[in-house]
Structure formats: structure tokens, C-alpha cells
């Protein structure tokens, strides 16, 4: 993106300052025609003259190479790891359920900001909780999706948050790839930790139903689906 921005600024300099000399950007200054102006001044002047200062592009992750025919290769730059243990309770009469406690440890590499990372882990788990316990998808007979927005399916709220929500960052995490601070992505991977909630609900159904029918519980494990499985 920086290349395209700089090209646009260069064209602006040529036109606005009536020059065709070589342009040099260095230490927050711009040099041309034996002139020196601050980069801030250039940006402000360009902005006031309605010069677009944004650009877009595509990023291609390095080292990714997968043969779709043989299914061999490297699908990801690196992996993140995590573990979660979830404790749940279910009501045998209604199918309602509640997460009592979740304990998570997650690998974020060499963390840049542990507070932000912890928040991302918590958010990813809750998002996955919605996927597996509340967000039921349905269609009409003609294939039209009826649950098309949060007004037509239930997303998790503060009420679905576990009573005890323990999150720890793996303090020996390290990314062998040359990325910023040797950190790891933490936005989406914790999403999968919520699978532990679904497995815990299946185990609860198994114990409540004397070992019967737990394999019939489908995701999302709504109160209705749990009740159907119990009876």
C-alpha cells in the first residue's frame, strides 16, 4: 500500500510544486528541487487539495503452498495451541443449561499486549459458545434462510458468560517464524476452544440419561435440542 500512496504523493508534488526533480523521503522530511518540507506539511497540503491518501491491496502469506490434488504442502504459516476445560449444568426438565466454569490456557507466542490477548481469547470462546449452543440455523422448504440476522437467532450475551472464566496465557510461547515480536494471531483460534462446552453438555446428557442418547445431541445444543435428547 505504501508504494501506491507514495506514487500518488509524487504525482501531487510534480503538479503542485511544478517540479520534475528527484523526490526523496527521509526522516519525516521530503526533499526535491533543493527544497525541504516536512512530511506532515506535505500530507496536510495534499489533503486540502483533495488528494486521496488511502490505498488498498492484497497480502499474501509467505511459505504457503498446498497442492489441492495431493492435499500435500503447507496450509498455514504457523500453528497456535490452546486447551479448555468446561464445566456445565443442565436442567433435566427443561433442557436449560449454564456454564459454571471454564479454564483456558492459550498460546499467543511472545505476547505484544497480554490484556488485549486475554480479551481476544475470552471473546473467541464466547463467539464459539454461540456457534455451538444458541445460534440455530433454519431454512424454509424452498431453501430461503430464515435465521439471517441476530434478530432471528440468539447470540450469546452477558448472561451466557461462565460464572468462573479463567484464562491464562501460555508464558513460554514463541513463534519460530519471523513475525512481529514473535507473537501469534489470537483473533480466531480461541473460537475452537468452545468445542469443550459442547462436549461437556454431551457428557452432562450422558450422565443425566444413564448413558443413553448423548450421541444424538446436535449442535447447537439449545435447551430444545437437549430436551429432545433427554426424552
What are these regions (language model features)?
Residues 2-231:
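C-terminal catalytic domains of large/alpha subunits in multi-subunit enzymes
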Amino acid at each position: 500500500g505504501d508504494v501506491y500512496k507514495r506514487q500518488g504523493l509524487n504525482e501531487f508534488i510534480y503538479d503542485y510544486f511544478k517540479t520534475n526533480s528527484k523526490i526523496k523521503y527521509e526522516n519525516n522530511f521530503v526533499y526535491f528541487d533543493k527544497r525541504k518540507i516536512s512530511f506532515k506539511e506535505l500530507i496536510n497540503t495534499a489533503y486540502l487539495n483533495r488528494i486521496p491518501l488511502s490505498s488498498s491491496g492484497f497480502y499474501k502469506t509467505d511459505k504457503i503452498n498446498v497442492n489441492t490434488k495431493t492435499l500435500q504442502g503447507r496450509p498455514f504459516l504457523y500453528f497456535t495451541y490452546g486447551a479448555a476445560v468446561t464445566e456445565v449444568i443442565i436442567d433435566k426438565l427443561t433442557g436449560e443449561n449454564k456454564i459454571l466454569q471454564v479454564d483456558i490456557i492459550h498460546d499467543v507466542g511472545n505476547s505484544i499486549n497480554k490484556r488485549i490477548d486475554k480479551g481476544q481469547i475470552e471473546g473467541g470462546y464466547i463467539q464459539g459458545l454461540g456457534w455451538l449452543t444458541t445460534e440455530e440455523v433454519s431454512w424454509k422448504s424452498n431453501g430461503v434462510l430464515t435465521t439471517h440476522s441476530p434478530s432471528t437467532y440468539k447470540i450469546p450475551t452477558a448472561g451466557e458468560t461462565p460464572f468462573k472464566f479463567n484464562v491464562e496465557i501460555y508464558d513460554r510461547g514463541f513463534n519460530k517464524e519471523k513475525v512481529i515480536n514473535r507473537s501469534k494471531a489470537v483473533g480466531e483460534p480461541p473460537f475452537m476452544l468452545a468445542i469443550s462446552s459442547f462436549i461437556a453438555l454431551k457428557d452432562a446428557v450422558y450422565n443425566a440419561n444413564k448413558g443413553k442418547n448423548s450421541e444424538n445431541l446436535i449442535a447447537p445444543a439449545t435447551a430444545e435440542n437437549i430436551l429432545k435428547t433427554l426424552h
